[in-house]
Amino acid sequence: MIKNGTCPYWERDDLSECARREYIEFKFPLFILLTGMIYAFCKVFRAFYLRGKNHTNEAPEFEEQGNGNHEYARFSVLRLKSAWESRSFCNVNNRSTFDKFKKFIEGAFIVLQLTIHLYILSSMLMDNKKFFHQGFLVQMFLWILLLVVITLRLISASQSFRWVLACKRDLWAVSFYSYASLFTLSILPLRSVFIGKIKDKIMVKYIISETFIDLALLLLLSTSSIEGTRYSFLVENENKKLPPAPTVFGLLTFSRIDRLIWKAYKHCLGNADIWDLDINNKSIAILANFEMSSKKGRLLPNIICYFKAVFISQLFLAFVSSFLNFVPSLLMPRILSYVNDPKSKSWNLVSLYVSSMLVSKIIATTCRGQGLFLGEKGTMQLRTVLISNIYSKTLRRTILKDSTTSLQKNASTSFEENPDSSEAEPRKKSSRKDNSVNNVMSIDAFKVSEAMNTFYLACEAVFMTVTALMILYSLLGWSAFAGTFALLAMIPLNFWCATFYGNYQADQLILTDKRTSGISEALNSIRVIKLLAWENLFYQKIINVRDGEIRLLKKKATIFFLNHLIWFFGPTLVSAITFSVFIKFQNQTLTPTIAFTALSLFAILRTPMDQIASTVSLLIQSFISLERIQDYLNESETRKYEILEQSNTKFGFEDASMEWEAAETSFKLKNISIDFKLNSLNAIIGPTGSGKSSLLLGLLGELNLLSGKIYVPTVESRDDLEIGKDGMTNSMAYCSQTPWLISGTIKDNVVFGEIFNKQKFDDVMKSCCLDKDIKAMTAGIRTDVGDGGFSLSGGQQQRIALARAIYSSSRYLILDDCLSAVDPETALYIYEECLCGPMMKGRTCIITSHNISLVTKRADWLVLLDRGEVKSQGKPSDLIKSNEFLRESINNDSKNTTHNQIDLKRSTTSKKTKNGDPEGGNSQDEVCAEVENFEETKMEGSVKFSAYKWLADYFGGLGVVFVFTSSSILIHGITLSQGFWLRYWLDTGSSGSKSTWLYRIVEGHSNIYFLLTYIIIGLVSSFLTSGKVWIAIISGTNVTKKIFAKLLSSILYAKLRFHNVTPTGRIMNRFSKDMDIIDQQLIPNFEGLSYSVVVCLWIILLIGYVTPQFLLFAIPLCALYYTVCTLYLRASRELKRIDNINISPIHQLFAEAIKGVTTIRALADERRFITQSLVAIDRSNAPFFYLNMATEWITYRVDIIGTLVLFSSSVMIIMKASYLDAGLAGILLSNAFSFTETAQWIIKVFSSVELLMSSVERIKEYTDIPSESNGYISPPANWPQTGDVELKNLSLRYSPHSSKALDNVSFKVKAGTKVGIVGRTGAGKSSIIAAIYRLSDWENGTITIDNKDIKHIPLERLRNSISCIPQDPTLFDGTVRSNLDPFDRYSDVQIYGVLSKVGLIEECDELCLIFEQEQPNFSSHKLRNRFIDLNTVVKSGGSNLSQGQRQLLCLARSMLGARNIMLIDEATASIDYISDAKIQKTIRETMKNTTILTIAHRLRSVIDYDKILVMEMGRVKEYDHPYTLISDRNTIFYRLCRQSGEFENLFELAKVSFDNKR
């Protein structure tokens, strides 16, 4: 009994009467009254005072911060008002009619309470009960306050009291707070009534009525939607569904998601079924709040500052949950004491103990669920912050080479920078780094965000550890500190393991970056890799990196084993030391009550210790990933917003010097002074490598400005510009040398965020010569271009990119050699109708080109560049007169309408949607054409058994799994024996135990014997458990190695169509996130699942053995388990699959932003792309958010069911107290304590396995994709010996729904013949090469080489037997040698020889070249080239070379391995005409006996060939000698030559060639 003065709080087994009167009926209600009244008054007064200023019907407004500069204006999320306004709308989530009716019921109950209190108060006054009426008076005033509050809540709908809406939520909170407090206070008096302690009939009725009315009011408010928030959700479209309005009950028990779970149970979910996010969880709101709370500096302090409220809440909830979790352990000694002596305590008191265990566990479960959900919501929000910041940084990051970060510290630096790089070149310059960016976004951001969950677990672990030690001290005295010291002694070992683990993790991430970089490079260049038959080369290269990664994973597994062993053995060691000190040094008797209470505490202590181990590991990984993100965010940013100066009258350079990097070898533009003519066509010309593209990038502010000034029309964001009367803005549009397209339709790529105007759109399509292409496409302008434009030809891509610039509202156009990929006829048409036509009225255009005769024809201003300097500039007519180079170029090349550059990007090499029969298309946009949609498919239903079997087969079959599970049963049996050993140890002195077989074994032994045996059992159990985990992880690592190899092989050898229709981001998702899941999460979860199932089965069997009556409870409890698990698993499975699918678009957005960052910045369109990223993040966050809610839904219910198991076990024990000994009861309760956690762990791990298995499904899906059909007849070693090629009736289409790319094509090429293939863009020229290389399956027909059907030749043998110079000049990360001769088949002399032949180095004696390489001091005046030696670094994609130089290197690669057949696909389009002529001469002289098929737009390149093949609409229209065709006025070839503008030269060259061959 505890006393306070003369009033005891507790009398034997119940609350004392004076305590009830003083505290329950007076002081506590007075506190509720005062706090509620003060809070309500303050809120109502504030709302009334601000009644004219508050607008509750508006979306949230965020005050802008920042320095007001242009960079801030472009990238600050606070400026994205369009995301709140025009691009979305607020949807009102109104309260239901029933909810409104509930308020009237609530008011009626309050009036009833007032009536009851008035009646009882009047009765007390009549009886003159002074003390009583004080409490009742306070409670009556409290109900009057609540009546006022409900009245204000009811009248808020009136127009006269609209101001009340501002405080409606606060008034609702006062009501809920009061009802909950009053109901809580009524519980103990109600118990007193039930156990008969209160005899007064009026008081009994009052207490019962008070309790149930309070309960009714509490349930009314708990199940009604929370008032005060009308505009709860922000949605992107009207079809987006809103979740149910939040209720207290729904929030606390996570019942808000019930409808979604039931829906998932009934049928499969789709994206349309996923509810929208709360406005506070929208990415724009998260980022706006984060930006306002952040300061410049490191990311970690800003994260802590932003999430401080979440951390404080988690801290409080962890404290409450941790303390309440120990209530059962505190009550356990009293229950065991009752079992030991049932007469020592009353039944009422013991039942109170058991009920308190139930209530405390329910409250602890609720607090824990809320704390974890706060962490999971924080995880989503932090992930949003990190991904958005990384994406924004990607748009701000400089394209220059000096932006290298620690992500690639060991990457070798490149040599002289690219002077003619284009849009894609800056991207590819750092492609290795860019692929690392993908890891930063997809892996590091996720790992860091998971730390939000870790924080709660860490707090809980600390609180639980401290609480457990305090209770142990109260139970065992100072001996508990001995165990504490042992615990502390293990911490340095843990940190030692953590340090090694962190180092291995950092090393692994570096290798992961390298691996994904290699995979990304392979995917981006897959067509060229297949042409070169280099699949195995890249396979081995990537596998070698993967092997290093696997070795580190195994090292991490070993460290994890040691760490796991330390912490798993910890409780045994601590308990053994504590017990030994307790017995030996304190001379105390260790009773079952003390021992098993301590053991329950040690068992509980195992959880926080395990959490500490895993938390340390996770935090180390998170900090490493955070540092990687910080390194990326610290990278150099573009300085364009600082160096560009705005001018309305000047557009150009003033004595400007620019460079790519601060290095002596870096290419520089020197003393550039150009004033481009406004409203005119300005042309920039110069030889290959002169710096034309660099000049344009300098004008865009992308290069380092060393001196001088750059003047542009504007540096403001596109959204901030005013539209003029002519419909244009003072902005710039950029069309890069390499066409950059986004995944979407043709219309999406052309309109590109502008307002759609059909007339303008049609005019642009026509002027860019796209109208006929659109008509030939089944879906018209709704045709999906594929990833980066894969479904289009290179010329189509280039024209679409040009159309985007023309369609834009920009008054200033910057076009980088945008006509190089189209035929002469198309080029001339575009130049005349587009660049010099009505679409350019009032616009300033700057264009670069090698086609001097074409661009000078109608240009108003001409700039001649050479070696980074302006040699001359002025009107074309003036320069032609004074400049011999121009006169010679024009005389030699006349008006050739072909240009200098072919498409670089890997996507442009694909020629998938070719022009078929125009009559078969439809030009009407309004027609709902069938669009071939390549959306990612989602598996439905449960994870198929085939997926589990597929994974098990890699482990060795289901037998191995059975053996593994059986070992878990044996190991946990050993663990349980520890408790039974302790029981027999404690019972050895009792008479009841002397008849047992165990007693006869242990009789006569000392406590040391028992203690050592206890330790040995624990050590064996810990070692076996940890060893099993280690074996599982090591085995899993070996399995993932095989799976990765299978996946990589499947992707590399897949048909090219798979790569054409599958976005790279989607494939990379398999290799990054999905593979990471299998590497590090799946197997540990499988192991944890098997162990937890075994533990639960043991516990149920044990409880059922000791108390068979428990089985009556077990049946309905198991039914409950099954029900909630079934509901959850179906929902979580569907949500996880949608989550996996919705992440891919974020990968795609990143990939597109990296590729097109220069174009995006040039268009000043950063805000729109940031907004798109936020929409994609929200779509990804929605299933992720509700998946986490569903996880807490099941966790809460499993915890409650587990609490019922503990409760029912306790009831069974006290009911059988006279039949049980305390030791057995202690074992029973100790295991019952751990049952809840174990059962929860089963559900969580099983659901995790189900969810993680979706990654296995996704990887399995990509391991089953069709591979290229391989031949089975190996030809002779010298095949092809002569080089005869024949195509017979060949038809080819790239997809079942597309037009034929080749339609019944037949022609024959004799050995040694050189054939030029010509035709307009999309005619099917490149499809001939695709057919010969078997890149696509033919519909019908045959191709024979030396009379052998190539369909039966093994693919690698076929492709290695043919030389090819592809349209895409693709180079790979490495050196000059590795790009030319990756298999080391040729000598340095041979390599230098071909470099000299293609003009990359000047003529020089081969011995001189080698000598100069070996003697750095030796200098040859003849050797002036960019290639210092064959080990010179080549960046991925050849980004540190100009476009022309890349083409020359590819030409050299093909000539080095020249075969009897060579296929050339526009290989010289991006070099100047003089170099082209030299190369053509080299080809003719060095390959006289080689069969050559050349696709060319430059007719001069093939005019002296043996044959010309004219293609049109996929058909062979003409095939004869050039002179024969050009002599016939009715031929297509004659028309092409006429349109080229150099007919006389072509005719003369053809005649000379014809005469020479006669």
Swiss-Prot record:
Annotated spans, Disordered: 410-434, 892-926
PANTHER family reported in the protein's UniProt record: ABC TRANSPORTER ATP-BINDING PROTEIN_PERMEASE VMR1-RELATED, ATP-BINDING CASSETTE SUB-FAMILY C
Keyword Zinc: no
Glycan-bearing residues: N4
Residue ranges, compositional bias (Polar residues): 892-901
Domain called ABC transmembrane type-1: residue spans: 311-621, 961-1251
Keywords associated with the record: ATP-binding, Glycoprotein, Membrane, Nucleotide-binding, Repeat, Transmembrane, Transmembrane helix, Transport
Ranges of biased composition (kind: Basic and acidic residues): 424-434
Chain residues that bind ATP: 686-693, 1319-1326
PROSITE patterns, per the entry: ABC_TM1F, ABC_TRANSPORTER_1, ABC_TRANSPORTER_2
Extracellular side stretches: 1-29, 125-130, 191-201, 324-351, 471-481, 580-584, 975-1013, 1106-1109, 1221-1222
Transmembrane segments: 30-50, 104-124, 131-151, 170-190, 202-222, 303-323, 352-374, 450-470, 482-504, 559-579, 585-605, 954-974, 1014-1034, 1083-1105, 1110-1132, 1200-1220, 1223-1243
Matching InterPro entries: AAA+_ATPase, ABC1_TM_dom, ABC1_TM_sf, ABC_transporter-like_ATP-bd, ABC_transporter-like_CS, ABC_transporter_C-like, P-loop_NTPase
GO cellular component, one term: fungal-type vacuole membrane
Membrane topology of this protein: Multi-pass membrane protein
Cytoplasmic side: 51-103, 152-169, 223-302, 375-449, 505-558, 606-953, 1035-1082, 1133-1199, 1244-1558
Pfam families, sorted: ABC_membrane (PF00664), ABC_tran (PF00005)
Localisation: Membrane
Primary location recorded for the protein, binned into one broad class: membrane
GO molecular function: ABC-type transporter activity; ATP binding; ATP hydrolysis activity
ABC transporter domain: residues covered: 651-892, 1285-1538
Keyword Calcium applies: no
Protein name in UniProt: ABC transporter NFT1
